[in-house]
Amino acid sequence: MITPQQAIERLISNNELFYDEMTDLMRQMMSGKVPPEQIAAILTGLRIKVETVSEITAAAAVMCEFASKVPLEDADGLVDIVGTGGDGAKTFNISTTSMFVAAAAGAKVAKHGGRSVSSSSGAADVMEQMGANLNLTPEQIAQSIRQTGIGFMFAPNHHSAMRHVAPVRRSLGFRSIFNILGPLTNPAGAPNQLLGVFHTDLCGILSRVLQQLGSKHVLVVCGEGGLDEITLTGKTRVAELKDGKISEYDIRPEDFGIETRRNLDEIKVANTQESLLKMNEVLDGKEGAARDIVLLNTAAALYAGNIAASLSDGISAAREGIDSGRAKAKKEEFVGFTRQFA
């Protein structure tokens, strides 16, 4: 077993930790056995050295081990729609809006998220604003997925062991490995995923991590300028894991008959209230950039979740989900379901 001090010495010498060593180290941190000063040194050392696929995979596997899981007999059809955050773009809650549209098109969505770190509004913030109850038990979340097609897992409720590292993370003031672990540790075990990241380098890295963790169909995306969504302003880098193989390619809005925008100003918001207003406009069928970016991201989620055979088919299904009124009804159904447990 590696000690925290040995790990620190390895990292400051610019040497990577082997999978078993990272597993041991992570278990010690998640069990509260590593003092804050050493956690800070470990996170700093990993960041400076740059985390490897093996180190991230080991850390994610341990986080899953310690997580409070959602008990579902059949998780094979589940899809998660999630972003790392950290892009600083201040856009409205695109992935949360896409969740309702995807569910309206027949997807079973198990969304894992938290409060805002760098954005104007996190998934949990906007869900609370719309009246949803975030504090469901794992069993109630499983029931929500079965009944409404949507389950929201509020990250702090499922990763209580994070309390041992959270204060250090906050005090460091820079991105650490934990910024990318959240989207890799879905408590419902969703094997399919649309994952937005803040740097194109992470597309290849995290697709390989998810491959090793046993994911089935994943699209890891990074929009031009570091947006952790499929963007409207130009190309989006995609790393797709499917049938055990990874392929990387670029997509653009015009590939799907959607107008490329010069900037994202039309979809930026200042706070949670504005984000919910923008979401409601999309679900009400209002045309514009907000609708278009939701169509693109929902299409990718439907494709990742194997509901749509292609991104183009996904666009059609997403459009129909909104225009039929089913997406708006799905939001109301989900909120109503959660409130019965308030």
Swiss-Prot record:
Residues annotated for anthranilate 1 binding in this entry: G83
Enzyme class: transferase
Cellular component terms per the entry's GO annotation: cytosol
E.C. numbers: 2.4.2.18
Binding site for 5-phospho-alpha-D-ribose 1-diphosphate: 83, 86-87, 91, 93-96, 111-119, 123
Cofactors demanded by this protein: Mg(2+)
Residues annotated as binding Mg(2+) 1: S95, E229
Family in the record: Belongs to the anthranilate phosphoribosyltransferase family.
Name of the protein in question: Anthranilate phosphoribosyltransferase
Source species: Neisseria gonorrhoeae (strain ATCC 700825 / FA 1090)
Gene responsible for this protein: trpD
